[in-house]
Amino acid sequence: MPPSPDFEAFSLTPIDQANGQVFFFYNISYRVRNEASALQTIHNAIDVLLEKVPFLNGEIAFPAPVPDANNVLIVRPPRAKSEDQVPLVQVKRHSNCALPVKKLEQSPFNVPSSLPLNGLFNPLAAYPTPNRPTPVIRFQINLVNDGLILTLAFNHAVFDALGAAVIVKLLAESCRNQDKIGMDGRLGIPSTQARVRSPLLALSSRLKKNNRARVDAPSPSEFSENISHRPVAAPPPLKDECFVFCAEKLQQLRIACTSILEKLHENQKSVTGQGDVRFLSINDVLTALICESIAQARHAAKHPYRDEKLHAKPSVSECLMAVDLRKFVEPPLPHDYMGNAAIPLRFEVSSQRHASPDFHRAVREVPTGLNTSFFLAIAKTAYTIRAKLARFGESYIDSLSSFLNAHEEQKAVNILPACAIVSSLRHIKTYELQFGAELGEIQAFETGIPWVNGSCIILPLCANSSDVAGSAPWNVRITLDESTMYCFKNEPALRWALLEQGKSKVLGPCDCKADV
């Protein structure tokens, strides 16, 4: 592989650095007829991609530290290679492995396998070695019995999920036409200047400077002393699985929730002063259903035996949903902006399922098979999500400031994980991409965060045409601790919303079931 052109080093934004150096992975499955030709196509495409976007072959490092200065991470051209450096592209063969793809019966759609993500497909570990330069991206081509899986590892300190999706789109272009990538007018090449001159850089830098004046962070010695005296419990074993939700059921749920918007508006306005909500999306109700089900599962996992005294006191859990800032900042960021531009939107869910009689009377029709109390909980949470999104353009600066401030305070306090952390990639049209004759269409696109308890990734639309998009299932990769996962998979609302083949009851060490 020829060396990529040099580029001018640039600093990462405060929001980039707040996400930390951790690698996320995109797994893209293809069925190929000629393995050698497919491999050559990918290698050539990566060469072209690096020629057009050379910083992708860069590395992240601290510049020479300056005393009493705000030392920031930079992306720079790679230095001399070391023997233990992970190659830019690796090829590995996996005996007795098949593509992690499942064909739905009587359906034109492929969905990802429900099995856990295979870490052997990743070119490097999720967490890089501390105090050493780390790569921006790495690729691994995994050869299996019926095709290949191209894994893209991207450093979250440089890209968010949408930024990494731009790389996939550029790679598809370079596979199709390796001489004219980015020259057809539909997608230009994002430059490093777009990052340096980004309004998000100026805004986040200003907010972080203001935050630093207010935060009294401890010295490194104080931090070490606090950590050494703090008891640390071993994290519970985690499980990740892809859940396939029925598009028709979710549409029924959205329509039913929309039918009580007026009542929800009256209730929420009196409680929180939230503005009016005119519509709910399927993304809203699915996020609400997932968060409500996980909250119930966590509550049930803590109290596996139905002790009324324990269940009498409901628990309130905080959930997070990633929101893209690209269209909110002024001027708006381009859609192909590769840097981090997502911050969390926070909302709460309660394990209590007792709605007022007025609410029950307002419900004209609950989808068959769904408990009325749980339906109302989903509707309320979906309303809260949509109301917060409607006001996000007015409040995102405060949210961004809080996000950056929390990053500063992680040195002083123990940041507890959320009940559920939802990110939606549904709108990314990955399956419509064409990768040329040797690779063809994507058979499945997978990603997840199997090391984060509560992470929920709504995967891209698994349809290669807008004509069938409305009936395409919703695929969600969810990671939970083992006991919560058992309870989650037995939640009635979840089983109702899944496609038929995923509805069987799961038996665990205890039959977990929260009160409804």
From Swiss-Prot:
Highest taxon in the source lineage: Eukaryota
Protein name: O-acyltransferase ausQ
Family: Belongs to the fumigaclavine B O-acetyltransferase family.
Organism, as annotated: Emericella nidulans (strain FGSC A4 / ATCC 38163 / CBS 112.46 / NRRL 194 / M139) (Aspergillus nidulans)
Any one Gene Ontology BP term: terpenoid biosynthetic process
Pathway the protein takes part in: Secondary metabolite biosynthesis; terpenoid biosynthesis
EC number: 2.3.1.-
Subunit structure of this chain's protein: Monomer.
Function description: O-acyltransferase; part of the gene cluster B that mediates the biosynthesis of austinol and dehydroaustinol, two fungal meroterpenoids. The first step of the pathway is the synthesis of 3,5-dimethylorsellinic acid by the polyketide synthase ausA. 3,5-dimethylorsellinic acid is then prenylated by the polyprenyl transferase ausN. Further epoxidation by the FAD-dependent monooxygenase ausM and cyclization by the probable terpene cyclase ausL lead to the formation of protoaustinoid A.
Sorted UniProt keywords: Acyltransferase, Transferase
Cysteine disulfide links: none
Extra facts: In A.calidoustus, the austinoid gene cluster lies on a contiguous DNA region, while clusters from E.nidulans and P.brasilianum are split in their respective genomes. Genetic rearrangements provoked variability among the clusters and E.nidulans produces the least number of austionoid derivatives with the end products austinol and dehydroaustinol, while P.brasilianum can produce until acetoxydehydroaustin, and A.calidoustus produces the highest number of identified derivatives.
UniProt-listed InterPro entries: CAT-like_dom_sf (IPR023213), Plant_Fungal_Acyltransferase (IPR050317)
GO molecular function annotations of the record: acyltransferase activity, transferring groups other than amino-acyl groups
